[in-house]
Structure formats: C-alpha cells, structure tokens
Amino acid sequence: MYLEKINAPEDVRQLNTEELRALAEEMRQALLFRLSRHGGHFGPNFGMVEATIALHYVFDSPRDKIVYDVSHQSYPHKMLTGRKNAYLSEEHFEDVSGYTNPEESEHDFFNVGHTSTSVSLASGLAKARDLKGEDGNVIAVIGDGSLSGGEALEGLDFAGEMHSNFIVVINDNDMSIAENHGGLYRNLKLLRDTDGKAECNLFRAMGLDYVFVKDGNDIEALIAAFRQVKDSKTPVAVHIVTQKGKGYALAEQHKEEWHWHLPFDIATGKTTVPAGGEKDYDTVTAEYLLKKMQEDASVCAITSATPTVFGFTKELRERAGKQFIDVGIAEEHAAAMASGIAKNGGKPFWGVYSSFLQRTYDQISQDICINQNAVTIAVYTASVYGMNDVTHLGIYDIPMISNIPNLVYLAPVTAEDYLAMLDWSLEQTEHPVAIRVPIQYISDGKPVTKNFGNLNRYEMTQEGSEIAIVALGSFYPLGVAAAEKIAQKTGITPTLINPYYITGLDTDCLEQLKKNHRVVLTLEDGVLDGGFGEKIARFYGDSKVRTKCFGLKKEFLDRYEVSEVLRENHLTAEQIAEDAVTMLAE
C-alpha cells in the first residue's frame, strides 16, 4: 500500500502518476473504512481526493499555506500530513477532528467549521507574508456552495486588488449541502459549459486571473494547473469541476443524503445506528409548516442552505413551492429578508442552527428587532446535547440574543409547547420571536391553553416551599429529577417552575417566592455568563433569598462526552440536590 508509507507531503512527491492514482484509490478505501464505522462528511471528501493529492504534490506545505473552507473536506489532507492512522485504524479514529485543527498538525492553520471564511483567512496569511517580506504560496480551497456566503465574496473582492501571490481553488461540484441557490451559479454553469472560456466570468470581473480544469478528479490535469499558478505574482482562481461523492455509487447518485452520513453498511448504504423515536422536531416542524402553507399563502419557510434542519427534504421543498426559500449560505441575508417579508405582511419562519445564528447578530438586532418586525426564528441544536465540535457548539445563543430589546425568546419543554408557540408567533404581528427548539422530543399529549402574547408569565407546575427550581426549556426534566432528589433527601417539596420565556422575568412570580422560599435554583442548557439565571440572581440580589445558577461555564468545548460535561458543571440531579441541601444548611 502507498498510503501506509505516506508520513508527510514530501512522500507524495516521490510517486509517479500511476502510483498517485493508486494512492487515490487507497485513500477512498480508507475514507470508506472510517466513515462506514464512524460517520462524518462523506461527499465532500470523496470528491476532493485527487485535488488534495495534486495540491500536496505541487506545493510545499506548510511553507506553502493551504486553507480549507469549512474544512469538512480536509480528511484527504489529513491522510497526507501525518494522520493516516486515523483513517486506517479504528482505535485511532478519535485522534483527529472532522475539521482542520492547528493542535493536530502544522499543516492546519485554523480551526474552521463555518463556511465562506477561507478566502478572508488566507488573504490575511498572504498579507502578513508580504508585510514581513517573505515568500511562499498561499492557497484558499473553497467549494462552490460556500461562494453564496457574503464573506467569501468580500474576500474575493479584496483579493482582486492584491498584487502578490494568492491562489483560490474553486471546488465546483454543483452542490451545497443540498442544491445550490443564487444567481452566481448561472455563471459557474456557463463557465463549466464553455470549458472556462465564457466572456462573462465572475472571477475575472473581480480582478483575479483564471484557470479552468474540466476534470477536477484527473490528477495529471490538476498537477498541470497547479504548476501553472505556483509562485504567481498576482491573485488567481483555479476553477476545478469535481464529482461529489466520487467513488461510491450511492453517494454519486444521492448527493444531498450523502453530504454527511451516519455509520452505514458499505454494501447497502443503510445506516447501522439504531433509529431514534418515531417523532422528532424536524418532522413535526415540516408537517406543521406544510399544513400552515396550504391554509395561508403568506406563510413561508426560509433556510440558509440547511433545509433538513426543519425537515424539508427535496420532496417537501417541491411541495412547498414558492413558499420555500433557500437563500444559500447567507444567514445575514436570510434574517434581513425575513424582516422585509414581515414588514410587507408575510409570515416568515426561519430555521437555523444555534451555531450559525452567530453569523447574523447584527441583522437580528438591527434589521429585525429595532424595526420590531414579526419574524419567527426556530433555533435548532441549541443544547449541550447538540453538535459537539468546537466550531458547531449550540450553547451560546441565550446570552447572544436574549438581551436584544424587543425580541421574545421562548423555551418550550414539550412538542405541544413548541407547536403552540409556533402558531402564536406566526399569527401575531407585534414581536420578533425566537424559539429554542429542544433536542429531546417530549410529548405529554396535553393541550396548551397558555396565551404566549401575555409576555413573561411563568408557570408554577409544582407548589412547595423553602426551595424553588426555575428550570428552563430542555433542562426542565432535569429540574423535575432534581426536585425529586431534594424531596428524598430533605422531606421538603420544592417549588418547580417552567419559565417559558428566556427574555423576560415574571416579577410577580419571583416576588411571591420571597414569602416562603430561602433558596432559588435556576437551570439552563447553555453558558451561564450573560444567560437566563443571572437575570433571576440579579432580581434577588438585594433580598434574603439565596440563588444558585446551574449551567455551563464559558469555554470552547470540543468533541466532549455530555455526561462528563454535565458532571463537571454540577448538572446532575444528584449534584443539584446536594448543593441545595448545603445551601439550606448554611
């Protein structure tokens, strides 16, 4: 095997063309081995094997600096830069993350997981090189889907005025996670159809030289193109046309499904991980929205390139027709456009991952909330139980958006809560609303009669004394368990409160607790600093009531075990009960 002998990029440069092709096949087999057992990004990596080999064959990493956009397509890069064992041996799977990571290798320059950043990051490397009077190539590798992000276009706009070496490799597989959306993709198609000869050329218009590679999975053609641009003195775009999922028939045929995949059986492609429950919030949301759309033509569902976050498969997107809007990887545009839709009488729903919400704070604050337009934002994977890569954490959204004036941020506990909140939000016209969608699907079958327009009214679900537990959203079940532990340890029945509202205090409820409670505990599924619990602690600051806030400390976690993080932050029912007993005794 050739791959077993590759310990660094210089080993790649010792191989001839036939050996490089054999290496590519071995790398795909290694990818198949790891991904079938571990899961991960499939299609992007299978399509980038030859291009990665050619990059390391022509350029001298890490002296020549390669920056991968999103970096979900960096598995082949890791194989060739000393980390092959993570793809050849199951016991080494956890040696690497799914993204570039400078702690792993000198060949990785940034922790990257969000999209459209590579051109800007790489242009910074190039600028620093020039300021210091150094040389060397700087290469940004970006997929065509990532070009729909504004930061990518900002970076290309800047690159067009550079007067030194800067290479942008456009990996064009005619796909984002799902299909691409946006006018610029007509130009990419025109360039593909004309072998890069079309007079209308986005990259030339931005001031970059341009090289086209018709077959981006042809190692010889790639090597020739990269040699052509190596040590260039002006910015240049190398447009390579690749096949997403190349080498595995199912991934070639079903590109969206195989963008990322759970562990699977290689022969059949069927997932080997046991399926979850019958219901989940993706499915429930999709069912609700489609019904709502049929009843009301002004309802629309917006996604920024992740339509399945709220269950909109290709079939459902087609059923929704013009009421489904995919803006591409453009969260800023999604938020601002939603505000415009609401302003003109539409009823916009925008579903977005908590981590990606970070990309559009200004539009939420300025364009939505200052204007007080009735946009509904569903925030997904906002939990310690969500994605656990450092670049995709969903634990910062409460401090980030709950302090924006005019916004109503809601925390449902059950599916019934969630659907009632959705219905209220889409029908009202007074408030921008965000809903923190739980991870765990809970249905109690109880009808929800609460009027969410009567803002900041908590629900006392269990009346007790001495100790009150205010348990927010997805941590409400933890509050129930902690209350039971406290009762077992002390004989005291704690008061249990479901607050529903992240953005406001029910001062009447909190004032009432002063009469017969000495301790108030708050529970939230996110970081404590600037969060929900601190607001309640501040309310009781000048009173005799003692408060303790339970949540996560402020840190960047990476590939963590949830149970360990919960224990470290005293977020088990037993630990919460012990702390409560200690507070009563003091």
Model regions and ranges:
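Glycine-rich ThDP/TPP pyrophosphate-binding loop and its adjacent helix/strand module
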Residues: 73, 108-265, 270-278, 282-287, ...
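Cofactor-binding active-site loop characterized by glycine-rich and histidine/acidic residues
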Residues: 41-162, 299, 304, 313-314
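Peripheral docking tails and interdomain loops at the edges
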Residues: 271-275, 386-388, 408, 527, ...
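Non-catalytic terminal/interface segments that mediate subunit docking, oligomerization
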Residues: 65, 248-358, 363-373, 470-473
